[in-house]
Curated annotation (Swiss-Prot):
Involved pathway(s): Energy metabolism; oxidative phosphorylation
GO molecular function terms noted in the UniProt entry: cytochrome-c oxidase activity; heme binding; metal ion binding
Entry function: Component of the cytochrome c oxidase, the last enzyme in the mitochondrial electron transport chain which drives oxidative phosphorylation. The respiratory chain contains 3 multisubunit complexes succinate dehydrogenase (complex II, CII), ubiquinol-cytochrome c oxidoreductase (cytochrome b-c1 complex, complex III, CIII) and cytochrome c oxidase (complex IV, CIV), that cooperate to transfer electrons derived from NADH and succinate to molecular oxygen, creating an electrochemical gradient over the inner membrane that drives transmembrane transport and the ATP synthase.
1'-histidyl-3'-tyrosine (His-Tyr) cross-link, chain position(s): 240-244
Lyase in keyword set: no
Residues where Fe(II)-heme a binds: 61, 378
UniProt-listed PROSITE patterns: COX1, COX1_CUB
Positions of heme a3 binding: 376
Protein name: Cytochrome c oxidase subunit 1
EC class name: translocase
Amino acid sequence: MFINRWLFSTNHKDIGTLYLLFGAWAGMAGTALSILIRSELGQPGSLLGDDQIYNVIVTAHAFVMIFFMVMPIMIGGFGNWLVPLMIGAPDMAFPRMNNMSFWLLPPSFLLLLVSSTVEAGAGTGWTVYPPLAGNLAHAGASVDLAIFSLHLAGVSSILGAINFITTIINMKPPAMSQYQTPLFVWSVLITAVLLLLSLPVLAAGITMLLTDRNLNTTFFDPAGGGDPILYQHLFWFFGHPEVYILILPGFGIISHIVTYYSGKKEPFGYMGMVWAMMSIGFLGFIVWAHHMFTVGMDVDTRAYFTSATMIIAIPTGVKVFSWLATLHGGDIKWTPPMLWALGFIFLFTVGGLTGIVLANSSLDIILHDTYYVVAHFHYVLSMGAVFAIMGGFVHWFPLLSGFTLHPTWAKVHFTLMFVGVNLTFFPQHFLGLAGMPRRYSDYPDAYTLWNALSSLGSFVSLTAVMVMIFMIWEAFASKREVLSVELTTTNIEWLHGCPPPYHTFEQPVYIKA
């Protein structure tokens, strides 16, 4: 029975739970890697060895956090659990494919871990640029294993994307229009479209890199008429939509939390929110070369990518101000999920502002590959995506488990995490402006103070992670059952109780048009 339920599952709730557990586990691994990075940088001099092992850790940290933590939790975990419940579907459109999407991830994770144990590991950075990723600078199988890992994770995501698109378009009640679905459902739909369009380009790029390394092709080798810049274009045509894939489901989660704990029936500007997400999704595909301002592009090309990138701030601003308008006049409950959501809105906005700075090609030429960039994307990921995940988790934990978290521990957890991530990443803006480059394991001692503070912050965040583990244990040990849930008519995922029965919506749902 155990094997049938958990290995061969076709139930969206069980598969969602598997994704959440896998993502939590990978998140621990990714956190451990980040602690190694910050320990190395806590003071000048060397702790772990040379730059190769350091860059292997940095590369693994990025891949683990992106492909095995944020995406499985947001899309696989929350997506699987909530999308069918929110649209009144009995399950996903392709339940067995859903199971395969999940089970491609553990082998993918294994390949990534193995890649760092053979030869000297893949110390390429998550971008895997040739010629550093070529077979001279990285002889041996490590980069090849990392590429295979990416292939598996990519196939998993593409299949999941097909499944979500089909489910959301086809499995609504006949009378329900697409514009009556909740914003989280919209965010997953748009994310799935982005995945479907961007991942094949990554697959093409890394497959060409694989043949360059092993079959003597020269796609990215000037000696044979290739061009390493082509790889950068292919990678970032995937890589930029990818960062929006990481944050869009978070937008959906935050919309639900802000609406719910403001006591509102609906978010402010529903249609504006939907169009904003669609605009962000579209614009995300036409700004990729802002990651490449330093490779020597024409001034008119740089002008285009600068202005196109800045345009994304407009739909993003629509979302931020709509969240604030949703709060306005509401009966605000200062619950832990609401704290995460408010933290998200503020810190994501700060990260967005540094993004506007980096969008200027003239400034980016100075700031490219410095800690300013690291600070920017960790503000939108470590305090955007992660805060959304935490907010969604503490908000929907009673739905998933049937038990309530201890609110005091949840607030302690939030406070520690808030202090930790800000202490870690705010000083990195100063390091970047002072010219400290990324991806080095050592630095001149002029940079010591801010690095020491940054590393101190990472240990505060580590403490927060441990508090979270305790908080989850405490909830399951105390078994406080959910008494009642408010606002169920406008939050239909709660209608079936906590937790909902194994099968929901077995008979078709009829809604008034």
